């Protein structure tokens, strides 16, 4: 709810309305001020009334709210990516502390709690001495199940925590996302996230020898990549198809294809990707 208050304040100030004018008969100026600061909520009827007072439609308001949330997600991910590739556990833990502090002062702490769990998952991926709690994984699963309209946040959440879940669950949830293609293809950024999620689901299925589910994601990736130039994603797919060959018993050909993909990442000047896929190769390829 505090996001709604912040967005409302931006609209009010940009339109040069005072607190008193915006509050009108709907609430007191102190109530509106607390709402803008995220310290309290407003009843739906009062909320719609204050929107009318500053002449903003609910459609325009919600568009701006989604953009506001999008910028929060992007800001967090911009901090996460360098920490992940540098194995900076202390940096992750600092971000976790910040999310906990935000949760404590928030009227809707779930968003920050889920961010904390996301960060814990990334810590566990980089350092095996850390573990995920089942309660945290259940909280994420419950949230995703109850959310009908996925945004960037849900795609990022599932896309980074999928490896902690049973392969059948990942395949089922992944299929549900893929089958909503018409929704995502209108939103370029979301479509790229869906492609990355499909690659992740494909990898997870192959790691667990779930070839029937893997074939579904392979076909989906072939379709969504099409003839477009997505060099990074194409090369990840090239590696994973090599991994599929290896897992199905064509070991020599599979190893050759995975090594080709790692060489391409090296030529492209992407040492972090080389290291990641070399680590994956070493984990699964047995002499």
Q: What is each residue range found by the language model?
A:
Residues 1-14:
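A short, Lys/Arg-rich alpha-helix, primarily the initiator
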Residues 154-231:
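Alpha-helical adaptor scaffolds
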Residues 16-33:
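Short alpha-helical DNA-recognition segment
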Residues 85-98, 129-138, 167-179, 208-219, ...:
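Helix-turn-helix repeat elements of alpha-solenoid scaffolds
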Residues 63-90, 263, 267:
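Short, charged recognition helix plus adjacent turn
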Residues 45-60:
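DNA major-groove recognition helix of helix-turn-helix/homeodomain DNA-binding modules
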Residues 97-104, 138-146, 178-185, 218-227, ...:
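Amphipathic alpha-helical segments of tetratricopeptide repeats
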Residues 7, 78, 112-123, 156, ...:
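"A position-specific structural signal for the A-helix of alpha-solenoid helical repeats
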